[in-house]
Amino acid sequence: MKIKNIIDKKNEDLIIALSYVLEKPKSYIFLNANKDLSKENTKKILDIENKLNENYPLQYALGKWDFYNINLIVDERALIPRFETEIIVDYLIKSNFNKECILDIGAGSGAISLSLAYNLKSSKVLGVDIEEAALSLARDNKKKLIIDNVNFIKSDLFENVDQKFDIIISNPPYINRNDYESLDKKLYYEPKSALYGGYDGLYFYRAIIKDASLYLNEKGHLIFEIGYDQKEEVNKLLIKSDFKNIINLKDFNGFDRFIIAEKG
């Protein structure tokens, strides 16, 4: 099979998959359309195509995915890291906030924890998750990337956390009951526990905000990723709990997606 045969299918996910299989940029694929694929790579790409035809997520089909400037193992043990989340990682890394100690609640694959630890060598990062499967994936990624300034523990939110932090960051489950029942088919391959945020999608925001100040140092910051229509409600919860200097950030599509708030 030639590379051109894949290009002719006009399937963007398949092009991305081929770039991962070949470990080459997408430009290489189009500049080398007449090259033959090896038997091994032909089998790999056809296997991936079959999975994509069943609405299986591309990232799971590949088993790996780039996030910020690290490459993660990705599988059904945890939520697929979204490129939008890189916005808040980048913001935090470049901020002048105190960030000696960082807590990531709902660490999942470890994408946020590991990218922060990798880029903030002097910081200590703790990732917590209630799901053993997700923790095993996060630890696999830590081992793969050889990052020493991050640890992962099992904890239901703050249950097993016994210290204070400069930063608490979380991308919690925030899909509400009605929206969950009408999701894209691909999303049902991801763990429900990483997507479903209760009847109104705000369960975890309420729970985290209620206790966050107890685990934040003075001038510490609480950072959330939110659903596109949740800004006002989460802002109200933060204000009610005496958080101040609230900042709202948008994603690449112009939707309200992140909230940063300082401990009051």
List where the protein language model places each region:
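Core SAM-dependent methyltransferase catalytic element
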Residues: 239-264
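Non-catalytic nucleic-acid substrate-recognition regions in nucleic-acid-modifying enzymes
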Residues: 1-13
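Conserved SAM/SAH cofactor-binding pocket of Class I
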Residues: 87-181, 186, 207
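Short loop/edge segments at beta-strand edges and connector loops
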Residues: 62, 154-155, 226, 250
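Short alpha-helix
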Residues: 228-241
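Conserved AdoMet
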Residues: 20-93
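Conserved hydrophobic residues forming the short capping helix/wall of the S-adenosyl-L-methionine
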Residues: 142, 212, 238
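Glycine-rich S-adenosyl-L-methionine
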Residues: 132, 185-215, 221, 227-229
